[in-house]
Amino acid sequence: MALLVEKTTSGREYKVKDMSQADFGRLEIELAEVEMPGLMASRSEFGPSQPFKGAKITGSLHMTIQTAVLIETLTALGAEVRWCSCNIFSTQDHAAAAIARDSAAVFAWKGETLQEYWWCTERALDWGPGGGPDLIVDDGGDTTLLIHEGVKAEEIYEKSGQFPDPDSTDNAEFKIVLSIIKEGLKTDPKRYHKMKDRVVGVSEETTTGVKRLYQMQANGTLLFPAINVNDSVTKSKFDNLYGCRHSLPDGLMRATDVMIAGKVAVVAGYGDVGKGCAAALKQAGARVIVTEIDPICALQATMEGLQVLTLEDVVSEADIFVTTTGNKDIIMLDHMKKMKNNAIVCNIGHFDNEIDMLGLETHPGVKRITIKPQTDRWVFPETNTGIIILAEGRLMNLGCATGHPSFVMSCSFTNQVIAQLELWNEKSSGKYEKKVYVLPKHLDEKVAALHLEKLGAKLTKLSKDQADYISVPVEGPYKPFHYRY
């Protein structure tokens, strides 16, 4: 794979699609800043003291306009940053160009191959001979996974001289990961150990990545402290819910121009993401059906006036299918073959394994017709009818549209800044062990408060007597940790 790192006139490394888009990216970044009060407040509060001075931060998170504002907040606080995207389709090329020119090393472009994607991840981790980053901002856990798999392979190599075998897995993406690690062992058999020893901690953005972290914690294999940003209330109850409520119909309409009203739409999963998607489809006039494994979530859906059925009950009747589960094997080839002609199938979970893309791609005689980028019609030979797959089964709101709007991402990314500051400021205190942590309630409330003025909201103030009556401080936090919002 003949990819070469390029350099700006100032010597900053990068690899993006088109640097001539940098001015366009800068204009949109300036618009987004006005819609991201939490990040701008973080610059005002922490910028003068430069708390990240000397810190090297690697980020693996969708390289969008909103992420550009996050990156420039980290650099405004003193950090050096190297960045890649966490999805092959989610990069906004003008955003990548603007950041590469002005602020940080970026390795990302829309439409990467899987090999290019992991090359970009490697580059974002490559801080030269001194080791890896001090801090990681992760989305989905791929960067964290690469370090952990690298350390595991180096330990096996040290004991037995055995290289990892890419042919030991059927997973095409994991084959690439093992190939990267194998090649790295030939030049530096301690590369990932050096990274592991340097990393102070990681802050993880998504449900999928958080699951990976908790699994590693349970197995005793987590190599450094982690902060679970996803489960901050001001992330999961806003980004996951209201963000998806905005960006799902945006992606559907940009990709297909379909009229949602009157259609039958199936939402697989009724967590925060599923709730946002179901609300958007219902408000657009669709008849929404939910599939669920959890009786509590299923009951919530019925209380919202939604039908709860199995996929098998409705697969031949629905017009739109949306997976939101974070699990695998939700819509399989047999389901797709039973769907209506031109049924729309898409995913707004994290990875591409909620929809059986491998089964579809390898089905004998199936024909793929690309309508436009990230919108494909797959025609089955048995019936000569087809289905429309968006973003190749990956995140359709970022592949077919521009993802969540700036304001709601300001909530999520302000949590990221606070998490990174917390890890960095406590790096020598021993406060954080090799475990997964959630930010405390008072910081969650602070993030929310930073976004109220922009919306014209005014908070009521408790009196001392009122605060004493409900046993909370006058200035908060106002809810116990176990409170369900």
UniProtKB/Swiss-Prot annotation:
Give the signal peptide as a residue range, or say none if absent: none
SMART domains xref list = AdoHcyase, AdoHcyase_NAD
Task: Provide the top EC class.
Answer: hydrolase
**Free-text comment on the cofactor:** Binds 1 NAD(+) per subunit.
Q: Supply the EC number(s).
A: 3.13.2.1
Keyword annotations: Hydrolase, NAD, One-carbon metabolism
Output the Gene Ontology cellular-component terms.
cytosol
Q: Which domain of life is it from?
A: Eukaryota
Which Pfam family, any one, appears in the UniProt record? AdoHcyase_NAD
Whether Hydrolase counts among this entry's keywords is: yes
Record pathway:
Amino-acid biosynthesis; L-homocysteine biosynthesis; L-homocysteine from S-adenosyl-L-homocysteine: step 1/1
Q: Where does NAD(+) bind?
A: 206-208, 240, 269-274, 292, 327, 348-350, 397
**Biological processes per GO annotation:** one-carbon metabolic process; S-adenosylmethionine cycle
The record, for PROSITE patterns, names:
ADOHCYASE_1 (PS00738), ADOHCYASE_2 (PS00739)
Catalysed conversion reaction = S-adenosyl-L-homocysteine + H2O = L-homocysteine + adenosine
Listed cofactors: NAD(+)
Give residues annotated as binding substrate.
Answer: T64, D139, E205, K235, D239
User: InterPro entries recorded for this chain?
Assistant: Adenosylhomocyst_ase-like_sf, Adenosylhomocysteinase-like, Ado_hCys_hydrolase_NAD-bd, NAD(P)-bd_dom_sf, S-Ado-L-homoCys_hydrolase_CS
A single Gene Ontology MF term assigned here is: adenosylhomocysteinase activity
What's the stated role of this polypeptide?
A: Adenosylhomocysteine is a competitive inhibitor of S-adenosyl-L-methionine-dependent methyl transferase reactions; therefore adenosylhomocysteinase may play a key role in the control of methylations via regulation of the intracellular concentration of adenosylhomocysteine.
Family listed? Belongs to the adenosylhomocysteinase family.
Q: What is this protein called?
A: Adenosylhomocysteinase
Q: Which organism is it from?
A: Lupinus luteus
Gene that encodes the chain: SAHH
